[in-house]
From Swiss-Prot:
The keyword DNA repair is annotated on this UniProt entry: no
Signal peptide: none
Gene Ontology terms, MF aspect: intramolecular oxidoreductase activity, interconverting aldoses and ketoses
Protein's GO biological process: carbohydrate metabolic process
Binding site for substrate: H12, R135
Enzyme class, first EC level, given as a word: isomerase
Protein family (similarity comment): Belongs to the LacAB/RpiB family.
Entry EC number(s): 5.3.1.-
Cited Pfam families: LacAB_rpiB
Keywords from the UniProt entry: Isomerase
Lineage of source species: Bacteria, Pseudomonadati, Pseudomonadota, Alphaproteobacteria, Rickettsiales
Entry protein name: Putative sugar phosphate isomerase RC0402
InterPro entries according to UniProt: RpiB, RpiB_LacA_LacB, RpiB_LacA_LacB_sf
Length: 144
């Protein structure tokens, strides 16, 4: 089974941002698996959320990124699995807390709602923040 650093997908409204993110992450020498979509033709976001979720569950990648117009539908779809902790983040603080307190394994971004000037900062914070454990582990065990 091939492994990657990050698995990524988007629906049609997140395609352009996804392409920019892939370029950014590849410049950091990260191995990225792109699950699509590969253009701006209308698709159903749950199909792409499931692809990322399945890859994380089978341990082919530890982290996922999902992008849609607001990220809300992607969040709902991804969080259907008890092994997934997907967090819709729109600033650096939410990205940091998603990892530090909630051990999030999928970052969700809203292409139409996020400040494009800080999107890479949000991604960097999500990728570099470590889970704090402790009381946060106790809390997470209550929702598994």
């Amino acid at each position: 089974m091939k492994t990657y650093n990050i698995v990524i997908a988007s629906d049609h409204s997140g395609y352009e941002l996804k392409s920019e993110i892939i370029n950014y992450l590849e410049q950091k020498s990260l191995k990225i698996y792109d699950c699509g979509t590969n253009n701006t033709q209308t698709v159903d976001y749950p199909d792409y959320a499931k692809k990322v979720v399945d890859i994380i569950i089978e341990k082919s990648a530890p982290i996922g990124i999902l992008i849609s117009d607001t990220g809300i539908g992607m969040s709902i779809a991804a969080n259907r699995s008890s092994e997934i902790r997907a967090a819709l983040c729109n600033n650096i603080l939410t990205a940091e807390n998603a990892k530090a307190h909630n051990d999030a394994n999928i970052l969700i971004l809203g292409a139409k709602t996020i400040d494009q000037k800080i999107v890479f900062d949000i991604i960097d914070k999500f990728l570099t923040t470590q889970f704090e454990g402790g009381r946060h582990s106790t809390r997470l065990s209550k929702i598994k």
